[in-house]
Amino acid sequence: MVCAPWLLAVVVVCVCNPGVGGQCWDSSHCKDLPSEDKILECTHLFRSGLQDESPEPRSAAQQSTEESLSLGILLAALTSGERALDADPEPHSDKRHSYSMEHFRWGKPIGHKRRPIKVYASSLEGGDSSEGTFPLQARRQLGSWEDEMVGALGNQGAKAQTKVVPRTLTVTGLQDKKDGSYRMGHFRWGSPTAIKRYGGFMKPYTKQSHKPLITLLKHITLKNEQ
């Protein structure tokens, strides 16, 4: 691939100057051309040799135009070959996959969920009647399960009947609670005794304890009036 543009450049030079063809291919310089500089040196060498041998004098303008034309064609051929090599270094493999974040929970999207396959007994047995859809063992299991459910429901109903309280009793109990003050008997501090109330420091005075105080107040008022 690398030698192709160089050979193309040599062919272009030979076509532009027909006399160069025979001399260039016979020489050892043109057989092994490792770089672009060698190709340019070879073309300049044989062009100068042809100019010395040719009897027709050429002007400087013609020489410059021919040189620029040949060099332009040579450089265009070389650059096109290099671009082709850079553009396609290796054929792209279709096996290249995108980066999948497998270490994350959302790395791979979940496809369609596998649903359980429903197998009907009618399709297995091939019967059309409703009684023949289930096998004998399945029908026995269903029958025993129904019996257990009926028994459990019966036991629950009997327990509920025993626990039922007459409505009249509940109504009277509610009325009694509304009439009387609610006492928190289920708490430790619901109804403390009179002695232990306020920690025993403030003992309630009895009716007899108030009598001396009342008589004292009466005497004071009588003295003030007199």
Curated annotation (Swiss-Prot):
Residues 23-97 form a propeptide. Specific enzymatic cleavages at paired basic residues yield the different active peptides. It is found in: Secreted. SMART domains: ACTH_domain (SM01363), NPP (SM01364), Op_neuropeptide (SM01365). The keyword tRNA processing does not apply. InterPro entries: Mcrtin_ACTH_cent, Melanocortin_N, Opioid_neuropept, PMOC, POMC-derived_peptides. The modification N-acetylserine is found at residue 98. This is Pro-opiomelanocortin. Residues 1-22 form the signal peptide. One of its GO terms (molecular function) is neuropeptide hormone activity. Belongs to the POMC family. One of its GO terms (cellular component) is extracellular region. Its main location: secreted. Keywords: Acetylation, Cleavage on pair of basic residues, Endorphin, Hormone, Secreted, Signal. One of its GO terms (biological process) is neuropeptide signaling pathway. The modification N-acetyltyrosine is found at residue 198.
